[in-house]
UniProtKB/Swiss-Prot annotation:
Glycans are attached at residues 61, 80, 174, 335, 465. GO terms for biological process: biological process involved in interaction with host; defense response to Gram-positive bacterium; detection of bacterium; immune system process; negative regulation of natural killer cell differentiation involved in immune response; negative regulation of type II interferon production; peptidoglycan catabolic process; regulation of inflammatory response. This is N-acetylmuramoyl-L-alanine amidase. Keywords: Disulfide bond, Glycoprotein, Hydrolase, Immunity, Membrane, Metal-binding, Phosphoprotein, Secreted, Signal, Zinc.
Length: 530
């Protein structure tokens, strides 16, 4: 029960932050884990969650999703319980939790986020809500009974799937019929009466509301905006790369997905649950229970396996309907039909699954500590028609952690700039064996990777020497499938692009015999004479 008690105290502080001095602790996931570990030592092995719930339910919260959270997450208080005292925590810990209490985006800065060991930035609030939903071990909550009567229940019969979900079959052409039939309303369906608690609390509600707002203002939602920390060793300030970003930043999506994945894990394992500090240390480290795939580096791949697009669309719709019924005064949701909410849910899910889950995670230049570009970059004329594959050769060993990959990036940039006298690192992108891509010159600047052809294609390099061995499967899948499909969708790469190895155009052994022989079996590979 320690996991419950510690998390309820943290959630209480999240929902009821008190003003005070800024924490001296760096905004690192390790600091959050440290905070949970300290709380776990203070919480007795009792039904502490019931005690804390009374306190949390009485808290004042300015969040627009307060009613959704209370309906799906918080239990009714017991009159026989006493409130936990947050002041028993150290002042430094109180200050840290208050600092990450609410996720927000203001004036180009993002609040309530921390830097994880894998180099990703994570919003704390949706992560902790997902953990709590998982600890409760109930995935489905009923709509409130008073909202099943007039005026909450409109009584509108949704004639068929196409009427309920305009464009859904076109939006998800690869969804199997059984999946669609299992998750979408049938021809007699009415107002949804259940909602997935994990996804509604961590992701679906925010996803739907953000796209609803942007559809009303005719503005794209700016899904997954990245940002830069003021420093990486002891980060304090996170500035977004797009000052017009929506709340669905990369950090928020990371936190929401982590919360859903870990909450799902907690709901399926037997009790007693492991200490949450231990679970987070594994997830943001080598992997939960030693599984190297079940960790934050591969959240997108694991998230894609957690739910299908039609299922997520259904859950986004149900979250919006529930919020509409719980908050009839909500301006965004007034005079909006369920069919319109279904359209928003379809659009939001399509964008999330294709532009986030379906795309590789790319660390921006600031994340690996890039030196400034020397001179003035030449813009590419997009879309390009070629993808050129390299291996770095030196560094020879694959990089398997953010720290080692970032160090390799800085080393290659120094060599390219100081020894070869290039303006910048030559590659467009570099592929680590840690589950991440690293931005070099990126999508818009001409690189220095394939002499004579730099303006015609993107240069992508695997870290390592692949003369006699291959990169890991995750890295290969990224370059073969995720990266080009995402670039095509964004209009950066032509659908009929050609894939070539470096050696086909320049006198070199790059990208190594083993890797090149594999490339020859890939789609879009083209034989040319050097």
């Amino acid at each position: 029960m320690k996991a419950w008690g510690a998390l309820w105290i943290v959630l209480g502080l999240l929902l009821w932050p008190e003003p005070g001095a800024a924490s001296s602790l760096p905004l690192l996931m390790d600091s959050i884990i440290q905070a949970l570990a300290e709380l776990e030592q203070k919480v007795p092995v009792t039904e502490a969650s019931i005690t804390a719930s009374a306190w949390i339910l009485s808290a004042k919260n300015s969040s627009t999703h307060n009613s959704l959270h209370q309906r799906l997450l918080l239990k009714a208080p017991s009159h026989n319980t006493t409130e936990p005292d947050p002041h028993s925590l150290s002042p430094e810990l109180q200050a840290l939790i208050s600092e990450v209490a609410q996720h927000d985006v203001q004036n180009g800065r993002e609040y309530g986020v921390v830097l994880a060991p894998d180099g990703s930035t994570v919003a704390v609030k949706p992560l902790l809500f997902g953990l709590e939903a998982g600890l409760q071990a109930h995935s489905v909550a009923n709509l409130p009974s008073d909202c099943l009567a007039i005026p909450c229940d409109t009584g509108d019969t949704l004639a068929n799937i196409r009427a309920t979900w305009p464009g859904l079959m076109d939006a998800f052409p690869n969804a199997s019929s059984p999946d669609v039939g299992a998750t979408l309303p049938n021809d007699k369906a009415k107002t949804p009466t259940t909602v997935d608690r994990l996804l509604a609390i961590t992701l679906a509600g925010d996803l739907g509301l953000t796209f609803l707002h942007r559809s009303q203002t005719w503005s794209p939602p700016g899904l997954g905006t990245e940002g830069c920390w003021d420093q990486l060793t002891a980060p304090r300030v996170f500035t977004l790369l797009d000052p017009q970003a929506s709340r669905l930043t990369m950090a928020f999506l990371n936190g929401a997905l982590d919360g859903a994945l870990l909450g799902n894990h907690l709901s399926q394992i037997p009790r007693p649950h492991p200490p949450l500090s231990h679970l987070l240390r594994e997830y943001y480290g080598a992997g939960v229970n030693g599984d190297p795939v079940f960790r934050s580096n591969f959240r997108r791949q694991n998230g894609a396996a957690l739910t299908s697009a039609p299922t997520l669309a259904q859950q986004v719709w149900e979250a919006l309907v529930l919020l509409q019924k719980l908050e009839p005064e909500h301006l965004q949701l007034q005079n909006i039909s369920q069919e319109q909410l279904a359209q928003v849910a379809t659009l939001a899910t399509k964008e999330f699954t294709e532009a986030f889950l379906g795309c590789p995670a790319i660390h921006p230049r600031c994340r690996w500590g890039a030196a400034p570009y020397r001179g003035h970059p030449t813009p590419l004329r997009l879309p390009l028609g070629f993808l050129y594959v390299h291996h770095t050769y030196v560094p020879a060993p694959p990089c398997t952690t953010f720290q080692s990959c970032a160090a390799d990036m800085r080393s290659m940039q120094r060599f390219h700039q100081d020894v070869r006298k290039w303006d910048d690192i030559g590659y467009s992108f570099v592929v680590g064996s840690d589950g991440y891509l690293y931005q070099g010159r990126g999508w818009h600047w001409v690189g220095a990777h394939t002499r004579g052809y730099n303006s015609r294609g993107f240069g992508v390099a695997f870290v390592g020497n692949y003369t006699g061995s291959l990169p890991n499967e995750a890295a290969l899948n990224t370059v073969r499938d995720a990266l080009p499909s995402c670039a095509i969708r964004a209009g950066l790469l032509r659908p009929d692009y050609k894939l070539l190895g470096h050696r086909q155009l320049v006198l070199t052994h790059c990208p190594g015999n083993a890797l090149f022989n594999l490339l020859r079996t890939w789609p879009h590979f083209t034989e040319v004479e050097n």
